[in-house]
Each structure stands twice: as structure tokens, then as C-alpha cells.
Amino acid sequence: MPNVKLPDGNVKHFEAPLTIYDVAHHISPGLAKAAIAGRVDGVLVDTSYLIKEDCSLIIVTEKHEDSLEIIRHSTAHLLAQAVKALFPSAQVTIGPVIEDGFYYDFAFERSFTPDDLSLIEAKMHELAKANLSITRRELPRNEAIQYFKGLGEEYKAKIIADIPENEALSLYRQGDFEDLCRGPHVPSTGFLKAFKLTKVAGAYWRGDSNNEMLQRIYGTAWADKKSLEEYLFRLEEAEKRDHRKLGKALDLFHFQDIAPGMVFWHPKGWTIYQELEHYMRNRLVDFGYQEIRTPQLVDRSLWEKSGHWANFRDEMFVTETENRHYAVKPMSCPCHVQIYNHGLKSYRDLPLRLSEFGNCHRCEPSGALHGLMRVRNMVQDDAHIFCTEDQIQSEVAMMLELVQSVYKDFGFTEIKYRLALRPEKRVGSDDVWDKAETALKLAMLGRNIEWVDAPGEGAFYGPKIECSLSDCLGRIWQCGTIQVDFSMPARLEASYVAEDGSKQTPVMLHRAILGSFERFMGILIEHYAGKLPLWLSPVQAVVLTISEKQNEYAEKVRKTLQKRGIRANFDLRNEKIGFKIREHTLQKIPYLLVVGDKEVENCQVAVRTRDGIDLGVMTIDTICDTLTQEIIRKGSI
């Protein structure tokens, strides 16, 4: 006779076993109608799940945080059902939930077309409207293999064959379609009201390029139509802001097959890059960092000693010369320890803050490469601080101050912080971990920072703070990290002489703010839709002539701007001024300075912004002062 404890603390007593749906109906018919699933003693289950013993229960409705994953998984099955109905020869493979949606891979003799997607989506709506019941059953593994082979679903049979022999499997049926799945699922297809198929792409079976190519259909699903429409709007905005398209349109960079995942920077793109580096270099000097430079190619012996060769070898580019094996560095940490080790260190030398714009290479899979966001050659704003355990808190507090200040200058004020805490397998004593975790927490408290704990997600060598930005579309980008490391200094024999004369191992703090310059530039381009703040814009102002008579004056204006440190250009072409304004507006140049006969006569310029705002006429000195002040203000404008 089960006693069921509800979230409000009330306990319901029942005389006989009953389903989640029955409990919901006992509370109210409206709740039963809205119930999507249940969470029994923390485990998600279907509404048909039979409660036989005492338990705690949460009824999951579309308002619950668990609902979207269940809705999306169920919609993936709805997609597979629709494809099988329209294209019976297609074979189903896998259909997981992903961020903001789902996908399903199919083996089919041809590629699905946009017209196919429209037909499939229409069929999905038809099946959802039919409100087909979704039921669950279990089959022994060997029976399940034979069952799917009998249906002609060879891929599904192969998936099941990889599951341990003694394991029972669950299958879900809706109408005449049945698929392998752990569940849970919504009670019926009528719960699936807001979905959209977004694209189709190729995908290798089991992610192996040696296997056959499958057709992957992507989709999104939400609890209601309003949420779906909001998401599709964000998707449309993201498409407009795609840094790869803007990079081409604004002539910033390009990629080529001759160097996969490596950027060819054009003059304007490189100007932005240099501005980032110049800005970061100045900020690091303000915070007491010493800039260093370390080799690109390092003997494998260092990587073996640091542990990278054993754990990171597949992601490293390696080469051999003169019977020695080298690796192009994937990260700078071991090399920074070599600089620390060069010469005896005393406790008086700590903390020692070393920074490098580290040029790193990683052998990312070709399928994972994505514009500037995922590259093989990246420059990281690496820094490593060597300090004592007692200095961790003050150093981390200083890092957090720098992180907040830098992000603000780039226009990011909504920062999310996550504290990755000790995992089960780790180096160092509990006392040391206690001290380090407490130091990180106190440093964040001192900066009035709120954070989320992530138990067990720290690296084996120390806890970590992750700093993530929220962009204008609400997307979260993890950029900054502050990582405590108890392992690498000892591995690489770093030491210092303590106050009592004993030899001690320093703590090493890994710190990045932008992450990789390439990825951060991609984030900036998308956040601002190419309209970068004035201080970052590759061309900050352009002088536009109305006729050839103003050419000499336009050159004088440009030179004056350049002498004042403003990146300026001019357009002396014999084109209509409206054409010039439109062209440079599309190039996202912040200020357009128009000069005609009147402006020449009065030593002025007519000022217009890229957003079409007419600021009137100004003297050359006034526009120089205006732009200079805006550049100085950076992200505070």
C-alpha cells in the first residue's frame, strides 16, 4: 500500500498500486490531463509507471524543467514515424535530444530535399493531431534483435547487438510505429504541439568517416507555440549574425582547404585581432603580468612528463626530424613551467604572473570545425600564476576583477560563473582541496559574484571557475577559466625556497579571459551583428566626397583623423553620394563624413552614423574629439 510524498510535503496514502496518471488524477483531473511524466525518487518515468512502494513523486507538466527533454525526445520519434510512413524503405538509426531540439539519422537511397522536409513536417502534424497513445513494453535483447531484423531495420538491430546480452530493452509504440528507447515519453502524440524541422545534413554511421553516409534531419520542439516562435526568431537572427557570412561580407577573413581550421586574416580582420591583443596586453601590464614567448615545437619528452602525451596525443600535431619526435604545442602550460624553473625561486618571488599570447595547434576532427568558433590553430590569452596556497584567494580575486573589467569593456555585463569542485579521482589531500575550494568561493564572495556549484566536475588536479558570457540572443559562451593546478608543478619539478628554508612546490593557477582570440572574435561579430564598437572597428570613419572638387580636402581630413589615432579612410570615386553612403553603411563603418563645397568652405564635415542618424556638421577638431572620447569609453557607451 504505497505512501506517496508530494513536493509540498504532503503524503498521500493509497490502498493499492497505481500509476503516475492515477496519482495526478487523484490530486485533480486538470493535473492528470497536463501530466507528461513523473519523477519517482528522482528518476524520470512515464505516466503509465506503476507505483507499488512508498516513494517521493513530482508530476512533470510542460511547466517543469524536465518537460522539454521529454517533449523533444518524443518529437524525434514522431519524426521517425512520419519518415517511415512517407518513405517506407528508409531505415531508422538513432534520434537523440540536443540543445534546443533533436535530430534523427536515416539510411535512405537518396538525400532528403527541402520539399521532403515540408512533407515530413506536415505528416508529423497529422500524426500529432491523431493523438496516438504511446505505450511501452520490454523485450529481451536477443528477441529485440530478431524483431527489428524482421522489420528490415538492420541498423537498429546492430545497435541492440552492442548492448549486453542479459539486458532487457524497452520499446515505445505509437500507432503502427515502434522504436527502441529508454524513455520516458509523453502519454500520446497530442502533447506534441509546437515543433519545426530546421535542416537536413549528412552524418556518418556511428560518427566514423569510414562508414556509410546517413541523412540527419534536425528539428526543434517546444512546450507551446509562443516559445517555438521566439526560438525561430532567435534562429533567424543568429543566421543573419553568422560570423562566417559577415566575415566574408565585411572582408575580414577566409578559410581554405589547403589549411583546414586555420584562418587567413585579411587586413581589416587582422586590425581587429591586433586591437584585441593590444588591449589585452595593456590590461595585463596594469595587473602585474610579465609577457613571455615560448617555442611552437617542443620535444615529446616534455609532453610525456607533463602527461599530455598520454592523455592528449590524438589531438596533437607531431613531426620527426634528426631522429627526434616533436609536437606542435596544443597549450602553453608546460612551457611556462620551463621559464619558471629557469633560476632559483624564493617565496619572495611569488606570486609570479606570466602571460603569453600562445599560438597553439590542436588536431580537431574536420567535421567539428566551425568557422572561428572551432579551429585547429588558435591564439590563447594564456597566463599562469605561480603562488603559495595562502596566495590563491588574493590572486583569484585579482583575476576576477580583471575578468569583469575586460568583459565590460567588450560590452558583456551578464556573466555566469560556475565552480567545478573535486572529482572522485584526484591528486592532493582533502585539506589542500578544502583550502583551494574555499579560497575560490571567498574570492567570488569578495567580488559579490553569484555562482553555481558543479560537484565532481573539477579536473583531477584542482578546482576551476568557469566564466560564461550571455550575448544579445541569450546564448551562453564559456570563455574565461581560472584553474587551480596541484599536479603540473610537481610533475615538472617546479619549486621555491620557503621562508623556513625548505623546498616547496608552488601552486599553479591557469587563467584565460578571452579563451581563444579566434573564437572570441566570432562571438563579438555575432553579438554585434558586425557593427563592432568604435574602438574595435577596423575602419572607424570614412570621408565621402560629393564630387572630385573635394578630393584634396577629403585627403586632408583623413590625414588629420589618422594623426589623432583614428583609423580613417576616404572614398574619392566618381559615384553618387547616396551610393557611397549605402555601400559604407553595409560595411558597418561607424561614422560617415560627407564633404561637399560648403563643408570645404567652412572646414567642416557632415557627420552621419552607420545607423542613419544625422549628427549635423562639425569641425574637424570636433569630430576628432568626439570619436576619441567614444574610443576611450569603450564598452561603457
UniProtKB/Swiss-Prot annotation:
Its EC number is 6.1.1.3. Keywords: Aminoacyl-tRNA synthetase, ATP-binding, Cytoplasm, Ligase, Metal-binding, Nucleotide-binding, Protein biosynthesis, RNA-binding, tRNA-binding, Zinc. GO terms for biological process: threonyl-tRNA aminoacylation. GO terms for molecular function: ATP binding; metal ion binding; threonine-tRNA ligase activity; tRNA binding. It catalyses: tRNA(Thr) + L-threonine + ATP = L-threonyl-tRNA(Thr) + AMP + diphosphate + H(+). Its main location: cytoplasm. It is found in: Cytoplasm. Zn(2+) binds at C333, H384, H510. One of its GO terms (cellular component) is cytoplasm. Its cofactor is Zn(2+). Pfam families: HGTP_anticodon (PF03129), TGS (PF02824), tRNA-synt_2b (PF00587), tRNA_SAD (PF07973). Binds 1 zinc ion per subunit. Residues 1-61 form the TGS domain. Residues 242-533 are annotated as: Catalytic. The keyword Plastid does not apply. Catalyzes the attachment of threonine to tRNA(Thr) in a two-step reaction: L-threonine is first activated by ATP to form Thr-AMP and then transferred to the acceptor end of tRNA(Thr). Also edits incorrectly charged L-seryl-tRNA(Thr). Homodimer. Belongs to the class-II aminoacyl-tRNA synthetase family. HAMAP family: Thr_tRNA_synth (MF_00184). This is Threonine--tRNA ligase. It comes from Legionella pneumophila (strain Paris). The gene is thrS.
